[in-house]
Amino acid sequence: MNYKGKAHKVGEHIDTDAIIPARFLVTTDAQKLGENCMSGLEPSWASRVAPGDIMVAGRNFGCGSSREHAPIAILGAGMPVVIGHSFARIFYRNAFNMGLLLMEVGDEVDKISDGDALEIDASTGAIRNLTTGAEITCPPLPASMAAILAKGGLVGYVKERLAQV
């Protein structure tokens, strides 16, 4: 899986309430959630995102309440990948289950600035900053996680597996 897009940096300890505030949890429609992605920090944030852009986060991204709406909102905003210093564990699992790729890179995240053009090869874990030339390597995903992502998330993966039984 390859991705190319503009970086949208967000801060540290961004919780799921900032990603998608509770007042928007009345739907699971990805487009509607995407229109309100990050509105807990800035109401018009999602309007700057183009399809294929990449979110870049600091430490402990996705902390707080466990809600599948948060990764759905990110996907609905058009961002298929979040590169981060670190992720809250429950958000990490929810993201993959919903089909959102997370790449945990530690302090290497500092090699990316807001607006940088990025290119990602998820199969190898290679992240290239096309703006600066910096290269970041993230461990490749385990085969089981890559298989879930390839089916758009856990529901698609399970449906396919059940069809084979």
Curated annotation (Swiss-Prot):
It comes from the Bacteria. It is an enzyme of class 4 (lyase). Its EC number is 4.2.1.33. InterPro entries: Aconitase/3IPM_dehydase_swvl (IPR015928), AconitaseA/IPMdHydase_ssu_swvl (IPR000573), IPMI_Swivel (IPR033940), LeuD (IPR050075), LeuD_type2/HacB/DmdB (IPR011827). Keywords: Amino-acid biosynthesis, Branched-chain amino acid biosynthesis, Leucine biosynthesis, Lyase. Pfam families: Aconitase_C. GO terms for biological process: L-leucine biosynthetic process. Pathway: Amino-acid biosynthesis; L-leucine biosynthesis; L-leucine from 3-methyl-2-oxobutanoate: step 2/4. It catalyses: (2R,3S)-3-isopropylmalate = (2S)-2-isopropylmalate. GO terms for molecular function: 3-isopropylmalate dehydratase activity. Catalyzes the isomerization between 2-isopropylmalate and 3-isopropylmalate, via the formation of 2-isopropylmaleate. Belongs to the LeuD family. LeuD type 2 subfamily. Heterodimer of LeuC and LeuD. This is 3-isopropylmalate dehydratase small subunit. It comes from Desulfovibrio desulfuricans (strain ATCC 27774 / DSM 6949 / MB).
